[in-house]
């Protein structure tokens, strides 16, 4: 690798927003390395990090609340470009001598801001121009407070009727603040705004590319594991497949993959995994049949958080059993990625509200015998896919829909039973098969079936059927932080429903989930 891809770096300080790591995703898409650190990062650590620019992210709190987070003094002492987003703008304004007040009109969702001032941040960037020549931007708002008085040196850059200071700028110091969220895809020019800050104002070079990331990850893995052996749980999903390819390239035969058949996998998945990796790629793969153990532990358990933790603990137990058959296994590799971390805690500050735990994050026991290797931990899903292609994995594998670590265990609502898993497997297979036939599989970001533990009356032929209900779920998203339900053709939905009810005797009714994220999550549990 000819260049240090970490040489030009942006520091993102997290105040607890669920969007914080999405900012990092955008900065990396621009091609610049960045790291997220908690808002109370020490002044010494900030100086040592030597960022070319700093982004103050959003957060759920108000600057008026007791003990609400503030930016460290080093943020201002470094005299590097500064960009405050939402709460980041508010605390920046308040700490520099401005004023923040609660807004009579809270803005959540789409808004149009008028660009009423001049500054490098928004120069030449607009969605609309009205008859009077006023530039407008379509943005995403999410705030209850607003800046009412700017610090010395700032001027108004953009405004809305209910938020006169929707953006502020001080070009002399390269300090900027916006009340909207440029990191969210609903802000149409958001990536251009962030690019302007990162590339032009901060002067960063775009060194963060797939080929450089692969080289860096391989070097990091080799430095971490040395000559030790590594175990990887290989599910056949995108994340674990990319990890397998990356580790196989980095350490070769030091890698042993364990495919755990937990009884909660997709139809024919076990055979497909073995064929792809063991036969085609030459990776060492051990197939462990642990269906009885998993289903036995899950019997009688309905709480989704408890199910996740049981699956996580049992997963590690199976690895322990396999590791004892091998010598000198020190590391456990996982396909943990950024969204896993985001939804488990929002970030490291403890300020964000926990939505759900993740199999790769919150369900692992503290006495785990292995050290973790997580080469994808800092990557978003689309970055992982680009890395997979860079490593030579097939397109259809790399762009396969995400599958949760706990598998069908979190797509069966309530208690998990073998009967439910078998029915769900068949229904899910039909849904995916028809999505491909109608050329809708790659138009959706994720699609699956959910088993609902309720029965409904149906009529098949001349007979009455009292059987289970399933729900189809399909979403469209770029970043998995926000998602809308996929507007599938009625003909497709009808075909899927008819096939499921006619071909699977245990199912009598099919529904379609039309919930978006937020407020719903993509998975039901």
UniProtKB/Swiss-Prot annotation:
CDD domains: GATase1_GMP_Synthase, GMP_synthase_C. SUPFAM superfamilies: Adenine nucleotide alpha hydrolases-like (SSF52402), Class I glutamine amidotransferase-like (SSF52317), GMP synthetase C-terminal dimerisation domain (SSF54810). The active site is at residues 86, 181, 183. Gene3D superfamilies: 3.30.300.10, 3.40.50.880, HUPs (3.40.50.620). Residues 9-207 form the Glutamine amidotransferase type-1 domain. Its EC number is 6.3.5.2. One of its GO terms (molecular function) is ATP binding. It catalyses: XMP + L-glutamine + ATP + H2O = GMP + L-glutamate + AMP + diphosphate + 2 H(+). ATP binds at residues 235-241. InterPro entries: Class_I_gatase-like (IPR029062), GATASE (IPR017926), GMP_synth_C (IPR001674), GMP_synth_GATase (IPR004739), GMP_synthase (IPR022955), GMPS_ATP_PPase_dom (IPR025777), NAD/GMP_synthase (IPR022310), Rossmann-like_a/b/a_fold (IPR014729). The keyword Ligase applies. The keyword ATP-binding applies. It is an enzyme of class 6 (ligase). Keywords: ATP-binding, Glutamine amidotransferase, GMP biosynthesis, Ligase, Nucleotide-binding, Purine biosynthesis. Residues 208-400 form the GMPS ATP-PPase domain. GO terms for cellular component: cytosol. Pathway: Purine metabolism; GMP biosynthesis; GMP from XMP (L-Gln route): step 1/1. Homodimer. Catalyzes the synthesis of GMP from XMP. HAMAP family: GMP_synthase. This is GMP synthase [glutamine-hydrolyzing]. The gene is guaA.
